[in-house]
């Protein structure tokens, strides 16, 4: 079963070929997800790795899409589900958006909001040309640039007892304390769960 994905990464454009990485996370032991792209796009067999601290496997497919004279929408299937992304035309400038500070530094702030993902929803509407900015349409968006705090992780200081205990040590002890295997594993599992939770939201 898919736990996350697809999450797309821009890999660059060379010789008028647009490169995209497709990230998918599935339950450990599941076969590779099936990815089908329309010709002349090509997909490379996926690489895989275990997700630290979780019973899950991360898969990455690389997709190469030859650019055409005009913008094109690439419709593809991932494990039977349809998805799409847009590729700018040859010599056209890609349309980009910029975001930072994804989430909440204090989880309590989220509870008081009716729509905690309102800005992500607006960005989706801009991409789909439903919304405009000052009467100007910006979709479809080809690239999303992310700045600082791509995912807030402040809660790790209270959710991980070993990390909290370390943070309460006097400074001389803190800087010499070993980075234990148990703390490393706890942090890996915490960040794996955090990324899966944040990036699986609609």
Language model region names:
Residues 1-202:
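Extended recognition/assembly regions associated with phosphoester-bond processing machinery
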């Amino acid at each position: 079963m898919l736990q996350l994905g697809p999450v797309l990464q821009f890999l660059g454009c060379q010789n008028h070929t647009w490169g995209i990485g497709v990230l998918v996370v599935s339950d450990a032991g599941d076969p590779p997800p099936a990815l089908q792209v329309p010709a002349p796009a090509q997909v490379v067999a996926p690489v895989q790795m275990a997700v630290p601290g979780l019973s899950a496997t991360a898969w990455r497919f690389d997709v190469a899409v030859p650019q055409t004279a005009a913008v094109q929408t690439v419709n593809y299937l991932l494990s039977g589900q349809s998805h799409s992304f847009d590729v700018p035309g040859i010599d056209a400038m890609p349309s980009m958006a910029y975001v930072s500070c994804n989430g909440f530094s204090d989880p309590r702030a989220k509870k008081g909001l009716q729509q905690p993902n309102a800005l992500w929803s607006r960005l989706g509407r801009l991409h789909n040309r439903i919304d405009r900015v000052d009467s100007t349409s910006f979709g479809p968006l080809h690239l999303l640039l992310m700045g600082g705090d791509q995912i807030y992780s402040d809660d790790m200081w209270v959710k991980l007892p070993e990390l909290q205990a370390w943070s309460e040590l006097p400074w001389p002890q803190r800087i010499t304390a070993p980075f234990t295997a148990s703390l490393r594993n706890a942090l890996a599992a915490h960040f794996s769960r955090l990324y899966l939770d944040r990036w699986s939201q609609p």
